[in-house]
Amino acid sequence: MHQRLATLAAARLYLCTDARRERGDLAEFADAALAGGVDVIQLRDKGSPGEQRFGPLEARDELAACEILADAARRHGALFAVNDRADIARAAGADVLHLGQGDLPLDVARAFVGPDVLLGLSSHDRDQMTAAAAGPADYFCVGPCWPTPTKPGRAAPGLALVRAAAELRTGKPWFAIGGIDAQRLPEVLDAGARRVVVVRAITAADDPAAAARRLSSALAAAR
């Protein structure tokens, strides 16, 4: 747990990726992204091109994809995260379980995954953010900063919520999330964030390692 917390504290770039079933290159992609500077890598297949083409990811296939990402994360000294599924997180030996507001309560998730798995929580307004900062989650995310196809129909609180998070001056790690890419990153940094979650900025890149490196370098320069 202590090593995971230390790795989390130093983390700046958090990537959510789908299982890339339509491409069949998950292992190669993960290695490239992690080599480029991704600190945390999470599997999130909801709404992905693979889901649209092949249907929802079955639990057995999700576990197999998790094992690929977990192995890559270990080799690169990064953290591997599972989205929503406490059972998959436990089975895959995940470092992190990330939960949304409508997922398992944190105390229930903690009882299921044990004391060594880090817990993260999404927040989408000031009340949720303040509660997340004060609560038992090991880190929290704030956003979306911009509307994103990853969360269709969800209103984006925008950079105002990022500014509010920065004003909390909490010692707990937090990440800005939602529609962030290399072009928008300066705005996010100006709002006070020093950690970000990205999706398409790396998953849609022709060169994932280069895309990750560009983001990681900008985050490092802003410390």
Swiss-Prot record:
Q: Write out the catalysed reaction.
A: 2-[(2R,5Z)-2-carboxy-4-methylthiazol-5(2H)-ylidene]ethyl phosphate + 4-amino-2-methyl-5-(diphosphooxymethyl)pyrimidine + 2 H(+) = thiamine phosphate + CO2 + diphosphate; 2-(2-carboxy-4-methylthiazol-5-yl)ethyl phosphate + 4-amino-2-methyl-5-(diphosphooxymethyl)pyrimidine + 2 H(+) = thiamine phosphate + CO2 + diphosphate; 4-methyl-5-(2-phosphooxyethyl)-thiazole + 4-amino-2-methyl-5-(diphosphooxymethyl)pyrimidine + H(+) = thiamine phosphate + diphosphate
The first-level EC class reads transferase
GO molecular function of the protein, one example?
magnesium ion binding
**List of residues binding 2-[(2R,5Z)-2-carboxy-4-methylthiazol-5(2H)-ylidene]ethyl phosphate:** T148, P149, T150, G179
> What Enzyme Commission number(s) appear in the record?
2.5.1.3
The domain of life is Bacteria
Cofactor list: Mg(2+)
Q: Give the intrachain disulfide bonds.
A: none
Which Gene Ontology terms describe the biological processes this protein takes part in?
Answer: thiamine biosynthetic process; thiamine diphosphate biosynthetic process
The residues the record assigns to binding 4-amino-2-methyl-5-(diphosphooxymethyl)pyrimidine are Q42, L43, R44, D45, K46, N83, S122, K151
Q: Which residues bind Mg(2+)?
A: D84, D103
Query: Entry's SUPFAM superfamilies?
Result: Thiamin phosphate synthase (SSF51391)
**Pathway stated in the Swiss-Prot or TrEMBL entry:** Cofactor biosynthesis; thiamine diphosphate biosynthesis; thiamine phosphate from 4-amino-2-methyl-5-diphosphomethylpyrimidine and 4-methyl-5-(2-phosphoethyl)-thiazole: step 1/1
* Keyword set, alphabetical order: Magnesium, Metal-binding, Thiamine biosynthesis, Transferase
Q: Which residues cross the membrane?
A: none
Which residues fall in a coiled-coil region? Answer: none
Q: Tell me a GO cellular component.
A: cytoplasm
Cofactor annotation comment: Binds 1 Mg(2+) ion per subunit.
**Pfam family for this entry, one:** TMP-TENI
User: What NCBIfam families does the record tag this protein with?
Assistant: thiE
Database matches in PANTHER family: THIAMINE-PHOSPHATE PYROPHOSPHORYLASE, THIAMINE-PHOSPHATE SYNTHASE
Tell me the protein family, please. Answer: Belongs to the thiamine-phosphate synthase family.
Describe its function. Condenses 4-methyl-5-(beta-hydroxyethyl)thiazole monophosphate (THZ-P) and 2-methyl-4-amino-5-hydroxymethyl pyrimidine pyrophosphate (HMP-PP) to form thiamine monophosphate (TMP).
What's the protein called, per UniProt? Thiamine-phosphate synthase
Organism of this sequence: Mycobacterium avium (strain 104)
- Taxonomy of the source species: Bacteria, Bacillati, Actinomycetota, Actinomycetes, Mycobacteriales
